[in-house]
Amino acid sequence: MDYGKTLNLPVTDFPMRGNLPEREPEILAYWQKIDLYRKVQQKNEGRPKFILHDGPPYANGDIHMGHVLNKVLKDMIVKFKSMDGYDAPYVPGWDTHGLPIEQRAIKDLGINRKEISPLEFRAKCREYAEKYARIQKEQFKRLGVRGDWENPYLTLMPHYEAKQIEIFGEMAKKGYIYKGLKPVYWCPVCETALAEAEIEYAEKKSPSIYVRFKVVEGKGKVPEDAYLVIWTTTPWTLPANVAIAVHPEFTYALVKTEKGDYVVAEGLVQQFFEATKLTGEIVARFKGEELLGVVTRHPFIERESPVVLADYVTLESGTGLVHTAPGHGTEDFETGKKYNLPVLSPVNHQGVFTEGAGKYAGMKIDDGNKAITQDLEASGDLLAMSFIKHSYPHCWRCKNPVIFRATEQWFASIDGFREQALKEIEKVEWIPAWGKDRIYNMVRDRGDWCISRQRTWGVPIPIFYCEACGKEIITDESIKAVSDLFRVEGSDAWWKYEAGEILPDGFRCPHCGGVKFRKETDIMDVWFDSGSSHAAVLEQPEYWPDLRWPADLYLEGSDQHRGWFNSSLSTAVATRGMAPYKAVLTHGFLVDEKGRKMSKSLGNVVDPLKVIKELGADILRLWVASADYRSDLAISNNILKQTAEGYRKIRNTIRFLLGNLYDYDHEKHRVPYERLLEIDRWALAKLHRLIARVVRAYRDYEFHVVFHAVHNFCTVDMSAIYLDIIKDRLYVELPDSEKRRSAQTVLYEILDSLLRLLTPILAFTTEEAYRHFPAKGKKESVQLLDMPKVEERYLDLTLEETWDKILEVRAKVLKALEIARQEKLIGHSLDAWVTLKASGELYDFLVERVNMWPEIFIVSQVDIQNEEVTGENGELPLEVVVNKALGEKCQRCWMYSPEVGLDPEFPDTCPRCAGVLHELKNRPL
């Protein structure tokens, strides 16, 4: 007889293989068809709000793994919150202005921005930005990210730009916006000023030179045939030198050498000798403050260079005397203000010397470096020259070195609201906690924010100039006129209309009454664009009615402490007096298995679009959940293979659960808790411990804890223990026996909870499995369910402690069975008869459960003997003996029994199976 047909073997259409690349798009189409985002919003209406405000990625190119990490983290949080009692809308956004998009538009569309009108150029940039916002939108959706994709925000939207103008106006009204001549980071390639957040540091090779300045007024301290020696790595800034700075507290030495007398810091004399190959002795010493007022002559320009005092001078390198050019450095500029020094910056927007540099006019900076050092060598003023490699600021877009250049720019004065910003930082929850110190120090130490850019693709600085008196005009009236116009026509209107057409009829200059005006030509820094998003998106309910201010959470990479978190904090504190976020979470960056950064040259870049095609989006989502995002995250094809293996184990567990519920109706067949078998109650306790741990981890944003807890539950508690033990009961017992229904009751609870717990991570797989789940009154999507709740009555500590001991016994038996298998004594564990030898409490414990052990060990027979056994090294005092099982093998359940063959109708079965077969035979078909 074919007994296979009499067993309750698993039945499910849920496939073993995920085949995610083919299956996921069909699920996506289903979500779109039912308008899942709106359904979730309707379900959660009236619940407390949780607003995760999306930091806008650049609408520039296809998505990369950094995007995946960021967007999936956000999606997991939003999905969890919407299943944990919150109304958690998610409005995605894009940053659409600025240099990156200008450069790509120029390159991809083959245009020259200097040969077409600003409006034409802006139209091309808009076309490029909108195209990539559309492309990225589809790519983010393909990742399973749920959001209001039909109503996202783009920083180029007219209503967004209008709100940004209002923010600028509020800051100006409070006196935080000013125009000033200051040294700013300047990219000669991109021809624009840059903010600190647009700077990257990279290694650069620079000349390292020692230059002498002849003393012309020694103040009775320094002989007038002596020289002061400076050290610099930027010879090109020497034409702008107007002073030499010394530290007031340092001791300086007059050193007599074979080539003249030189003044350097006493602590750097030896270093000076080594660099210049000079020898000599110290003949005099003086404090830095005594040198104030000493005057030197510039080595190649007819100009004096006096000594000034500055606390930032160090003894780390050089000579302790600092070449000071207020037009080329922030500290130099502050010193220049203190001593009323001229601000010279004889370098134009392309990094070419102007007439102010004398004979070097027309040269590029690098050529100037060479020419200046050659001239210094010819005049004998170059004492030493070498080359060094050092960390130097580079432009974030074109990757070229930047310069400091004094130009007239628009600034936001941080001093006006710095103290309030620091107070607000203290109120925000920073995740990880070190983020607080990082942004606190940045805000405490940062200079004023340069907000003007000499480009075209962006929001204009809404300032007018009076043609009569030349003064800047920024009033409530002018700001409102610009904001109202932009709300209707967008910022293109600034280039479309003359100043007089933008300003209200009859507008007059508030300074002189003039009636003719011109517009500012600079645009705003893109960090001002995205930094205004808290107001432009969260405070415009007519466009995004689900949102509110402030946000509960901002979540970006840790580089945004000086970027978006900082600019958002600045605009919010300046205009509203408080931070725009209650909590800020940061993640690390991507590295390969060896800890190296992703780069095309190393060939270690993982393309997410390729991974989705080959493995599926759920594998990427699981990778994000499995890694601890608080530090740098490793990604490689090998790591993704390991992730896919982890996925397979979770999927197999889900499939087993589904397969064994094919004939189960929870309403009809559910066994009350009190009547569940002990092992089933243990599994339920394990499940509810898991629920408690996972929900807590989600609330703490510890997704790697979620993954490892669920993975461990599936592979250890379930596959290796519980599911293995109950297979016999599920397959062999009568289909509707209470023993089998007891197991099924718990399998149903486990599956129901697992699908909910995994939905924020494995969005596609849980949706697919939910379709196969035999529940009554199912929702349209698993995402419309809530998180499972912990049932305290299932957390039976006494039961769990008992089972810890049972599993300790089982572990020792499994080891013995494995040895017996290796020795060819048995094949399958059911071939075994196990003898347990113990005494005392353990013997009593074993005897109490004598009928349970064969099921627990998955063996045919177990007997227990009372013998003294000592447990070595804290081991269980238990001896396990494995022998070949007694009797014949039952052809239905494969257990051995001396009673096989007693039933004449089913002579090759054990009494248990014979009883089941008789019962089945007597049932109507």
From Swiss-Prot:
Residues where ATP binds: 600
GO molecular function terms noted in the UniProt entry: aminoacyl-tRNA deacylase activity; ATP binding; isoleucine-tRNA ligase activity; tRNA binding; zinc ion binding
Motif 'KMSKS' region: where in chain: 597-601
InterPro entries listed in its UniProt record: aa-tRNA-synth_I_CS, aa-tRNA-synth_Ia, Anticodon_Ile_BEm, Ile-tRNA-ligase, Ile-tRNA-ligase_type1, Ile-tRNA_ligase, M/V/L/I-tRNA-synth_anticd-bd, Rossmann-like_a/b/a_fold
Cofactor binding mode and count: Binds 1 zinc ion per subunit.
Disulfide bonds: none
Role of this protein: Catalyzes the attachment of isoleucine to tRNA(Ile). As IleRS can inadvertently accommodate and process structurally similar amino acids such as valine, to avoid such errors it has two additional distinct tRNA(Ile)-dependent editing activities. One activity is designated as 'pretransfer' editing and involves the hydrolysis of activated Val-AMP. The other activity is designated 'posttransfer' editing and involves deacylation of mischarged Val-tRNA(Ile).
The protein's name: Isoleucine--tRNA ligase
